[in-house]
Curated annotation (Swiss-Prot):
Alphabetical list of PANTHER family matching this protein: PROTEIN PHTF2, PUTATIVE HOMEODOMAIN TRANSCRIPTION FACTOR PHTF
Ranges of compositional bias, category Basic and acidic residues: 210-219, 391-400
GO CC terms of this entry: endoplasmic reticulum; membrane
Residue ranges of the region described as Disordered: 190-239, 304-401
Compositional bias of kind Polar residues: 220-239, 309-333
Biased composition (Low complexity): 378-390
Protein's name according to its UniProt entry: Protein PHTF2
Transmembrane residue ranges: 136-156, 164-184, 497-517, 553-573, 634-654, 668-688, 760-780
Subcellular location: Membrane
Biased composition (Basic residues): 200-209, 359-369
Presence of the UniProt keyword Transmembrane helix in the record: yes
The organism of origin for this protein: Homo sapiens
Length: 785
């Protein structure tokens, strides 16, 4: 065997491709042709080695042909222009994966490590925290961090005897690490990369990159956006800072930086707005865009919405020198304060303005020399009309109205694209290569929304019934208009504050738990009334005259209440999101019911045509993906894992020392955590199960099939058409049953095997505790099954 391996390695180093042999595989024919890997990957090499013994002559012949095809590629293949059929649907559309959400590029292990490091060394990562949070929240977290450090120092430095347990002081540290990890995973989709260099060299390099890209685009070259990023990332290494420099920069950033929402404009992806909904145009509002370029220097030149010159007239009359000067100044200011990623995002916005200037100037040049050609003119007017209408709709709207931004942008872009496609199809490709860049970057021209890219994008309409008071009217409505009305109804719903009040109460209870624990350990309930107020004060705070102990207790109380409140506030946000998902599902189910549609003030239509079924499936998948998805799932999964850990520790403590279980301070807190988290998880499971049940309700399709048979009876002449629709409804019912899955909490429960293992472990632990307390053997997992 050793000789075979040696010969295989020699053969592997000398031979490039495997030749077809007619004899049995020998020592020098052990590697298959598809494994052209380096010797560094030992696992793959051994896989190739042992796989060679399974091969036959036909497989080697096939591999030889595959290698030949790989060498030639598609260059010699005859190719014709083809187009994807936009009027057909894919299984991704029905499943919902066609409406993709932003995902982090790093694995969860790396994000967890980064979150822990950024919490432990909080002051040294102040720029990152300023970019992913607001300035007020950053100062609040900084104060809590310093107070926690002070509490640990006071606990270690005190010499007088006291009754303060160590868990009371270090307990908030674990919660701080958990919150930091959760926040790092939430913002991981558009967290700016750390700057690789500082100082004037970076500013000069960014300024040079900005000028270079503007001149290249003016010459018509197809430079990508990675030019600036590569210029920044290839420059030098990060310089080391002393502790004094860090705190001096922290003090400087505290009073001069506006770090409210810088990170949300750093990467050119679909941004997630304040209420959690995705804005597909790549930017939230004009206000958030301006926040990203604010600077403390008074002579900084920024670009306001009215100065950005989106309309055609301003683009035609704007001087190129002023445009390049503004681009240079903005790039300089951004690079000096926000790092390369944020400056890169802003320069993309500015470069597109310059791109429009150069494109219109080139259009004017073509029109001067070729007055009979209308293609450049139509292309320029189309892009200008689309961008100016979108800019006008955003400039006169507050930042909070994100849903109107979404739907108006969708409709504006759809109308502009449908009105200009027939005029500027070939000419724009030949004359304006910059338009191709905008076409590629435009999220409306990507493949995430296939039902928007038909011959009339976003304008495929179905006949729907709407109510105006007591009058019943019929109107042709598109998917965007129907979903917009559903969105308006969901946004107008007033959420309850019951769980928020419950979270506030739990925060206060967990903060007062150490005081109650010391009182219960010092005196009995009968003797509690016999003590004076001063004696109870001394017992609750653990000391009478020691200022260090009193300060430590007060600091621990403030930090504990604040961190617990933040965690339960995030759970309340997740509960509100789950409630909105349930409202989406309810209103979607009301579309095909006349009585419920009138009561809910949403349109009503029947699935009497194949086109209606297609729109119904598209609308169903789209509404399922609306709102926050991954960010809320991170919060829920963290609560789920925390609950499992708390329940496991409580069960272990009860099995080990159940007689003195309440004699430990941390056991009191674990019981309160277990009860409160269980209530929230039950709420999440209830809302999620109801939402899945609403979307998986096939009774709607069965009812529509009955309606088709009733219509066949009244109109026998349309029997063939109605039979076709009935068959499509049957196929849709089978497809939904195959694709839909029951609701499960995000995290480990998504894997059925791990879900069952976790379920058995928890139920086994609880069964052991109950059996030990009651005196007889009880197996809960058998009862549940």
């Amino acid at each position: 065997m050793a000789s075979k391996v040696t010969d295989a390695i020699v053969w592997y180093q000398k031979k490039e491709f495997l030749s077809v042999a007619t004899t049995a595989p020998g020592p020098q024919q052990v590697l298959p042709g598809y494994c052209q890997c380096s010797l560094k990957d030992q696992g793959l090499f051994i896989q190739c080695l042992i796989g060679a013994y399974d091969q036959q002559i036909w497989e080697k012949s096939v591999e030889q042909r595959e290698i030949k095809f790989i060498k030639l590629g598609l260059r010699n293949k005859p190719k014709k222009t083809a187009h994807v059929k936009p009027d057909l649907i894919d299984v991704d559309l029905v499943r919902g994966s066609a409406f993709a959400k932003a995902k982090p590029e790093s694995p969860w292990t790396s994000l967890t490590r980064k979150g822990i490091v950024r919490v432990v060394f909080f002051p040294f990562f102040f720029r990152w925290w300023l970019q992913v949070t607001s300035k007020v929240i950053f100062f609040w977290l900084l104060v809590l961090y310093l107070l926690q450090v002070a509490a640990i120092v006071l606990f270690c430095s005190t010499s007088s005897p006291h009754s303060i347990p160590l868990t009371e002081v270090i307990g908030p540290i674990w919660l701080m690490l958990l919150l930091g990890t959760v926040h790092c995973q939430i913002v991981s989709t558009r967290t700016p990369k750390p700057p690789l260099s500082t100082g004037g060299k970076r500013r000069r390099k960014l300024r040079k990159a900005a000028h270079l890209e503007v001149h290249r685009e003016g010459d018509g070259s197809s430079t990508t956006d990675n030019t600036q990023e590569g210029a920044v990332q290839n420059h030098g290494t990060s310089t080391s800072h002393s502790v004094g420099t860090v705190f001096r920069d922290l003090w400087h950033a505290a009073f001069f930086l506006s770090g409210s929402k810088k990170a949300k404009n750093s990467i050119d992806k679909s941004t997630e707005t304040d209420n959690g909904y995705v804005s597909l145009d790549g930017k939230k509002t004009v206000k958030s865009g301006e926040d990203g370029i604010q600077n403390h220097e008074p002579q900084c030149e920024t670009i306001r919405p009215e100065e950005t010159a989106w309309n055609t007239g301003t683009l035609r009359n704007g001087p190129s020198k002023d445009t390049q000067r503004t681009i240079t100044n903005v790039s300089d200011e951004v690079s000096s304060e926000e790092g390369p990623e944020t400056g890169y995002s802003l320069r993309r916005h500015v470069d597109r303005t310059s791109e429009g200037v150069l494109r219109n100037r080139k259009s004017h040049h073509y029109k001067k020399h070729y007055p009979n050609e209308d293609a450049p003119k139509s292309g320029t007017s189309c892009s200008s009309r689309c961008s100016s209408s979108r800019q006008d709709s955003e400039s006169a709207r507050p930042e909070s109205e994100t849903e109107d931004v979404l739907w108006e942008d969708l409709l504006h872009c759809a109308e502009c694209h449908s009105s200009c496609t027939s005029e500027t199809d070939v000419e724009n490709h030949q004359i304006n290569p910059c338009v191709k860049k905008e076409y590629r970057d435009d999220p409306f021209h990507q493949s995430h929304l296939p039902w928007l890219h038909s011959s009339h994008p976003g304008l495929e309409k179905i006949s729907a019934i709407v109510w105006e008071g007591n009058d019943c009217k019929k109107a042709d409505m598109s998917v965007l208009e129907i979903s917009g009305m559903i969105m308006n109804r969901v946004n107008s719903h007033i959420p309850g504050i019951g769980y928020q009040i419950f979270g506030n109460a739990v925060s206060l209870i967990l903060g007062l738990t150490p005081f109650v624990f010391r009182l219960s350990q010092a005196t009995d309930l009968e003797q509690l009334t016999a003590h004076s107020a001063s004696e109870l004060y001394v017992i609750a705070f653990g000391s009478n005259e020691d200022v260090i102990v009193l300060s430590m207790v007060i600091i621990s109380f403030v930090v504990r209440v604040s961190l617990v409140w933040i965690f339960f506030f995030l759970l309340c946000v997740a509960e509100r999101t789950y409630k909105q998902r349930l409202l989406f599902a309810k209103l979607f189910g009301h579309l095909t019911s006349a009585r419920r549609a009138r009561k809910s003030e949403v349109p009503h239509f029947r699935l009497k045509k194949v086109q209606n079924i297609k729109m119904w499936l598209s609308l169903r998948s789209y509404l399922k993906r609306r709102g926050p998805q991954r960010s809320v799932d991170v919060i829920v999964s963290s609560a789920f894992l925390l609950t499992i850990s708390v329940v496991f520790i409580c069960c272990a403590q009860l099995l080990h020392v159940h007689e003195i279980f309440l004699d430990c301070h941390y056991n009191w807190e674990l019981v309160i955590w277990c009860i409160s988290l269980t209530l929230f998880l039950l709420r999440f499971v209830t809302l999620g199960s109801e939402t899945s049940k609403k979307y998986s309700n096939t009774s709607i399709l069965l009812t529509e099939q009955i309606n088709l048979y009733l219509k066949m009876e009244k109109k026998p002449n349309k029997k063939e058409e109605l039979t076709l629709v009935n068959n499509v409804l049957k196929l849709a019912t089978k497809l939904l049953k195959e694709l839909d899955s029951p609701f499960r909490l995000y995290g480990l429960t998504m894997n059925p095997l791990l879900y069952n293992i976790t379920q058995v472990v928890i139920l086994s632990a609880v069964s052991g505790v109950i059996s030990d307390l009651l005196g007889f053997n009880l197996k809960l997992w058998k009862i549940k099954s």
